[in-house]
Each structure stands twice: as C-alpha cells, then as structure tokens.
Amino acid sequence: MKREVAAQIEVAVTAPTTLEFQVAIASPLGAQLTESLAFTVNGKSIEPREMTGPHGTRIHKFDAGEGTVTASYAATIIGRADPAPVREIDLSTYLRPSRYAEADKFYGFAATEFGQYADSETLLEKVSSWVGTRLNYVPGSSDPIDGAADTLLAGSGVCRDYAHLVIALLRAVNVPARLVSVYAPGCSPMDFHAVAEAYVHGHWRVLDATCLAPRQSMVRISTGRDAADTAFLDNHKGAVTLKNMTVTAIVDGDLPGDSIHELVSLG
C-alpha cells in the first residue's frame, strides 16, 4: 500500500511564544518513508528541535516572535508499519481516567451497558456502534475543553469527541484505550482525524465510531491519553491565531473496504 499525506498550516503570532507541532507521522518501523518538513517565521526558514514522545510521536518545537509562522509537511509511506508494541506501562497508563476521557464518570453506566462483553473483541464493535448511533457528527458543535461526559450529554461532536467517549467507556470496563491522531485517506471533511485504539487479546485495535474513513489506510501521527497529548499545535506563553490549514491524505488506487465488525490495527 502506498499512501501520501500532507499538511500546510499558517499561524499568526501576536505575542512571542514557543510552538510545538505534531504533524509529522510517527516513526513507521517496517514501512518505507520519504518526507519533507519545513517551518518559516516571517518568511525565514527556521530549524525546529525534534523531541521524540511515546509510540514514535515526533514533536517539533521552536520559539517564534510576532508575525506569521508556516508549517509545510509532506510524506509518502510505502508498505505498512509494524503493529504497535505492547508495553506493560501502557496497559496501566491507558486504564486511568484523563482530562478528556474521564472514565471514572462512566463506571456504573458502562458496566451496565457493556459489562457482559468486557475483555472480548466483541466489546470493541459494541462500544463503537453504540457511540456512532448515539452521537451526531456536527462540526463546530463542541468546545475544545469538552470531555466525554459533555459529549454524551450534548449528543453531538466531531472526531475527537467520538474518540474520547469510546475511550472513556472502554477504560470504564477495564480495557486500556488511548487516542491516536491520524492522517485518514478518504475522510470527509478532510482534516487531521482522531480515533481510539484499544488493547484486547494481545493487540492494539483501532476504532473509529465516526466511520468517516477506512481504518486500514490511516497513518499514525501521535498517540496519548486524549487530545491533550495529541494536538497538532500547542502554544506556550504567547498568543496565536490559526489563519489557514490544509490537510490531504490519499492512497494509491482504491480505498480499502472497512466494516465495523472487522478487527483492524494501525499500520
């Protein structure tokens, strides 16, 4: 499989700050990667510092004064990355409640709704289907500080809201779950996409309750407890405004078929 992804971002900085971008794909061990990444501040090229986070996540950090910052990324991936490794520390970390996936608010509800499927592969289908039918995908309907409980009460949201609710419900029935930011060929509207990843029977499996794109062709960018760990841009100290952003993701040939009944791992 050959996949091509790209992102173009323009940010206005109105007070000096430190920026952290997470737009480069995670190190795809086992796949062939060709990529380019460039940043400018007021038209001048700047070399970022690359920090490596968990699960191959790459964060590019630099200081920026007032003016215009641009980020340009493009990558071609040939083949599939190796399955995500399983570490004991991850199985502990991704069971805990977090800022946007507050599993402790769902213990009783999730046990009643899904307890009979706990620790089974059927659970993944049941939770994903339940969230997908309970929520309406409405761009702009949620607030950036909304968590899973807010989303359930509102009954609507975008991809990160769907993923947070899936994650919270899974953690509430003792299944480790985490959020993954991905490039998603076929996604409409095209954007950075957020999905859930759950650990069952020795494997990390990807869930997308929005069903907006086939999971088989998704490309991992960053992985964490929730959106607090995976945002494509973090701003520290100053003030910024997102002016323009274009994301593209395509696969060579036809998009793969997908079914909520399938067990799929990112690769």
Predicted regions, residues:
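Intrinsically disordered, low-complexity N-terminal segments that are enriched in acidic
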Residues: M1-R80
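Secondary-structure boundary elements
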Residues: V13, A71, A81, P85, ...
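Generic structural "secondary-structure junction" signal
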Residues: F21, A64, G79, Q116, ...
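Short, charged, solvent-exposed linker or helix-capping segments at domain edges/interfaces
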Residues: F21, P83-I89, D208
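Residue-level signal for pocket-adjacent positions within structured domains
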Residues: T57, D90, G147, G202, ...
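Short, charged/polar, Gly/Pro-enriched secondary-structure boundary elements
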Residues: R80-A81, R205
